[in-house]
Structures are given as structure tokens and as C-alpha cells.
Amino acid sequence: MEQTFTAPAPTGKKILCIEDEHFISELYVRALTRAGYDVTVEVDGRRALQLAKTNQFDIILLDLMIPSITGIEVLRHLRNKAETPKLHAKIIITTNLEQREEIRGDIEKQADGYLVKAEITPRELVEFLGTIR
């Protein structure tokens, strides 16, 4: 099983990347670290939820299909103000093309945005996150 790892950056926003596909998370870490972000990666839903509750992240990149609990469950916990009263992070769903329909409705309303992994390059990811305030 993969471990949680952090790619520190000297300054910048803190990102929690909840992604179990190692290749994808490595691409994100390289691109975002070069852009000055401080990136923490977690592959497991429950551990990611604990990290989000105990750390101040600016942005959370949340895959829907992750081990232990789904990204949808993580999102619901994060948006529950009783559980996460201090959470101010923007939550961006990262999904595969096949999962696009899953994020319609309530899920889309709870997230601050979503990205389809196959449709965005690392450079475009950095540009997109640069627009988030």
C-alpha cells in the first residue's frame, strides 16, 4: 500500500490531492510543486478525511474512486459544517470521463468545481487552480 507523501514548496497555497492512481498524483505533484504549491497526496479516503480535518488546505483535489470510502462520501463529510467547522478549502472533483454523470446534481453543488482527468494537462491544471480564490 502506498504511503501519504508531501512535496513541499517554499511558499504558496496548500493542496491536498486525494488520488489513488500513482501516475496521476505524480503528474500533479510535479506540475503543482514547480508552480509553487505545497502538495500533500493521500490515496485512502478515510486518511484523507482526517488530513483535511486536522490541516488547513487551500484546495482539495478529490478523486471519486478511492479506497476505503468513496470521494462522494469524503465530499459529504467535508461539507458537513458540524464535522469540519474550520474547513475553508475549495474542493475540486477530479474524475474520469465515465464518471462525469455521477457528479451531476447534489455532488456538483457541493463541490467548487470539477475536472475530467483525460481532458486536462498538468499545465492546464496549474492554470485552472491559479484562478481559484
List where the protein language model places each region.
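As written
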Residues: 71, 106-113
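Acidic catalytic/metal-coordinating carboxylates
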Residues: 44, 70-76
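Conserved acidic segment of CheY-like receiver
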Residues: 12-23, 28-32
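Short hydrophobic/Thr-rich beta-strand motif most characteristic of the beta2 strand and flanking loop
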Residues: 36-43, 51
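Non-catalytic signal-transmission and effector/linker regions of two-component phosphorelay proteins
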Residues: 1-14, 121-133
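The feature encodes the CheY-like receiver
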Residues: 67
